[in-house]
Amino acid sequence: LARLLLEKGADINYHKPDMVFPYASTPVTEAARSNNFPMVRWLVEQGSNITLVDKYGDRPYSVAVQNKNQEMADYLKALEPEDWHNEQEKVRQLMPYKLPAKLVEYLKTGPLRLEFPERELVKWAELYSFMDVQEMTWKRKKLLSLMVQMDNYSDYLLLWSPRDKKLWYLDIEHEEFHPLAKWDDFIADPGRYLNGMIEGEFEK
């Protein structure tokens, strides 16, 4: 079907939001999201632009990282601009976000998987490594997305806001955006904050 659509002149990099894909993702990003490596490879060979990001900063490589598909991530990483995976360049790129040194150090050294089995709703979460942190814009605010995924809930983003130097969260489904905590407070007890987030404790 994809081959037929391209033969008929479809835009391989089409990424306007619609009812099916409201986040303005490209076909190759959606192929990565469904873990379809052969389709990703085929779309790339047909000229897909793997550097285009969707509304939440995702691109094929970051989706492969989220899906823990190392083979796909390695394939896409090799095709991306080299400086996207260069630590000095990443430091330069993220300077405007005024990240605390402790946060940067944590994302470089880990542990990136946070576990709190005694909690009820969310028992674990996984943060991005420093190199994989994603830039995104929400209602004209420039933010950094720090969390790959968390237990039971896929519609929440954990974000760093340079404006007040705090963690915020975004409930994608309900478009709720609220402040959560300073980094030091959050990392001292992430289970409390992530479960409180789900329970609506921080909605102000």
Residue ranges and their predicted role:
Residues 85-204:
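Helical anchoring/docking segments at protein termini
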Residues 1, 38-39, 71-72:
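Conserved ankyrin/ankyrin-like repeat signature
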Residues 1-20, 91-92, 96, 107:
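Eukaryotic tandem repeat interaction scaffolds
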Residues 70-74, 84-86:
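Alpha-helical linker/edge segments of TPR/alpha-solenoid repeat scaffolds
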Residues 15-29, 53-59:
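Ankyrin-repeat boundary/"N-cap" motif
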